[in-house]
Amino acid sequence: MKPVETENRKVVVVGLGKSGLATARFLLRRGALVTITDQASEARLGDLVVSARDLGATLELGGHQDSTFLSADYIVVSPGVPETLAPLKKAAEKGIPVMGEMELAARFVTKPVAAVTGTNGKTTVTTLLGDMLKASGRQVFVGGNIGAPLIGFADKGENADMAVVEVSSFQLDTSETFRPHVAVLLNIAEDHLARYVDFNAYVRSKGRIFENQEADDVAVINGADFHVLQASKGIRSRKLTFNAGKNTQDGAVIGDTAVEIVTAGTKTATISVTSPLMRARHNMENIAAATLAALAMGATVEGIQAAVDGFQGLRHRLEYVASIDDVHYFDDSKATNPDAVRRALEFFTSRVVLLLGGEDKGCDYGVLKNVIRERARAVVLFGAAKEKIRMAINGSVSLWDAGSMAEAVRRAHELAAPGDAVLLSPACSSFDSYESYAHRGDDFCNAVKKLKEGDHARG
């Protein structure tokens, strides 16, 4: 794969965020003439502007200029920048190359890369896979759509002998030559439909993770997910499956308390799982996928087991917060689509008071109606999408409104019975009221803390 030229090339970087800043740094170090453009104002971007100017980049803020795009040698877009952006379309029509940050990095990375994508579980599997390799004595860069962008590994690749990256559909959309040695596709369910023409376009986007793999590469796929199986049809790499049942020939068989690795029909390793949270079905799938990828990247069984034993899950993912009057509070703010909510509800054996709402992503919330009827005691709705959700799940259980997170938590506590769980698992993005899902989760945790400290506790 031939690296792109950088010396004295005019490069436009679209989006001044963590990815855009890292991209600009990489290019400027290699002699490029970099302009960073962003629709946001200088005041809103704050310290990022200072950092970009310190690097020596030219800045165009508060909007995009067609002339800047049309005079570029090539354009690098940050994750999440839509392909429909007018100046981008004009540049592409003129034949100016447009690529994503990850694609640029792929042109320069020479060490093995494991890439993880899927609608749900990406961050958990990426983190756990990194832990497994580190516990096996490997020097590993972990990043991508989480943490440091892959371009940072291309910039300082000598610090690690391999990379593990989380990859979003947005990043795959702007990649042409990206070839991970190990590609993991966890699951595909409705998400980001406000961006894609239809669900099939989203499925195709996820399947691009396998596009450039060859016979000596490895694909780790969910054998029980119809859309994953469709997306991985006809790929050239060697397939390892998880979640496909006891007849698996090459892959992982998931039990209640362990994951068995099978090679050519023979069991070759067993990974035990002791944590109740990690024994949740979706986390057992995550462990199976991470284990297969780790082995393919050279991890040891001992290192994998040590990583699983020490892994306590990530923040805002079915995270236990507190108990008040025998009602147990869980923060699952990262659940930003209906499938993630379904998985969360299936974890609980008790009744759940569910907090749903936020900014709509174009998903069908009606798929939650049955599982809510089976698992929930009540639902508290909040945020911009609450009326759409109400129409979709009406008739399942009692529905209540809240104007704020604090009100939602108070209402949930009033509705819950002893032994119940109160679960923030919103099925929506957070951007109607919050900077991020983490900001929303922190608000929930703070509301629970105030409830615990205040006068609202019963009895």
Curated annotation (Swiss-Prot):
Top class in the EC scheme: ligase
Function: Cell wall formation. Catalyzes the addition of glutamate to the nucleotide precursor UDP-N-acetylmuramoyl-L-alanine (UMA).
Keywords, ordered alphabetically: ATP-binding, Cell cycle, Cell division, Cell shape, Cell wall biogenesis/degradation, Cytoplasm, Ligase, Nucleotide-binding, Peptidoglycan synthesis
Coiled-coil regions listed: none
HAMAP family in the record: MurD
Provenance organism: Desulfosudis oleivorans (strain DSM 6200 / JCM 39069 / Hxd3) (Desulfococcus oleovorans)
Protein name: UDP-N-acetylmuramoylalanine--D-glutamate ligase
GO terms for cellular component: cytoplasm
Location(s) in or outside the cell: Cytoplasm
Pathway: Cell wall biogenesis; peptidoglycan biosynthesis
Species classification: Bacteria, Pseudomonadati, Thermodesulfobacteriota, Desulfobacteria, Desulfobacterales
